[in-house]
Amino acid sequence: MRPWLLLLVGLSSFFALSTSVNRAKNSGSDFDLESRASTTNVHSILSKRKLRAFGGDTNTLKDSGKARREEKVWKLFCSVFLQLDDKKKCMFETNQVSSHQPEPRPALSFMPGPKPAHSLVPESKPVRSLMTGNAPVRSIATELKLVLPRITETVKNPSKSQVVMLWLHKVADFSKSEHGVNTMAYRTLYEWLSPSFSDAKLAKFFVGLREDEALRETAEKMLAYMLIKSTSTEAVGRAWLKSGEHPSRLFESMNFKEADFKDTVFLGWLKYAS
């Protein structure tokens, strides 16, 4: 074969190969454009495909193995062909797992030291009634199981019973409230304790309660009422002397009237003042 003929055949083959490569590139570009355009409708395509193959007509879904294979193929199509970053977008709704994570429980904090005062009192109806000033003092004591031995220990050493002292604070609040004006809670307390304690012991106890600012007024009223009810003023007089209370302050707390000036209580105060 002549050289020029071989050259012609070679050039023809080269041009034919170049043309086929260009056509392949052009067709690939068109295909890429179509695939990118189809991503805008991917959710509708997925829904139709899913509904037709898995969820739309249960009568057409006979073979579970085929369904699993279809699902794997479809996920592969989503992840490779459409090149989605989040493969969960291609998961079927029937197989989706909720990504919601429950909020962690708050850590329990165990604080060292004594509990707050309110935790010493059980949450019961009488206690809540006392908080609002509606319950008798005796019913609260019964609910809190403030039996006489416990009260006895408190009278001997008030610092050892936080519950009883808290209850006494409620007695003071109750006596100052609108509901406690007529019930005179401090009188009830004295009448409850007087059968078990001597006047000297109660006088010392009430004088000691005056050191608590919240119980000062109630303690003074209890002392005054005790002096009125007591058969002897000596115990109260000794308690007054020990406390060093000024006579004018005692006179105000006793709330004497003109008719009381001839009473033994007034005479006892006069003896103390002199």
UniProtKB/Swiss-Prot annotation:
<feature type="signal peptide">
    <location>
        <begin position="1"/>
        <end position="20"/>
    </location>
</feature>
<keyword id="KW-1048">Host nucleus</keyword>
<keyword id="KW-0732">Signal</keyword>
<dbReference type="GO" id="GO:0042025">
    <property type="term" value="C:host cell nucleus"/>
</dbReference>
<comment type="similarity">
    <text>Belongs to the RxLR effector family.</text>
</comment>
<keyword id="KW-1035">Host cytoplasm</keyword>
<protein>
    <recommendedName>
        <fullName>Secreted RxLR effector protein 144</fullName>
    </recommendedName>
</protein>
<comment type="function">
    <text>Secreted effector that completely suppresses the host cell death induced by cell death-inducing proteins.</text>
</comment>
<dbReference type="GO" id="GO:0030430">
    <property type="term" value="C:host cell cytoplasm"/>
</dbReference>
<keyword id="KW-0843">Virulence</keyword>
<keyword id="KW-0964">Secreted</keyword>
<feature type="short sequence motif" description="RxLR-dEER">
    <location>
        <begin position="49"/>
        <end position="72"/>
    </location>
</feature>
<dbReference type="GO" id="GO:0005576">
    <property type="term" value="C:extracellular region"/>
</dbReference>
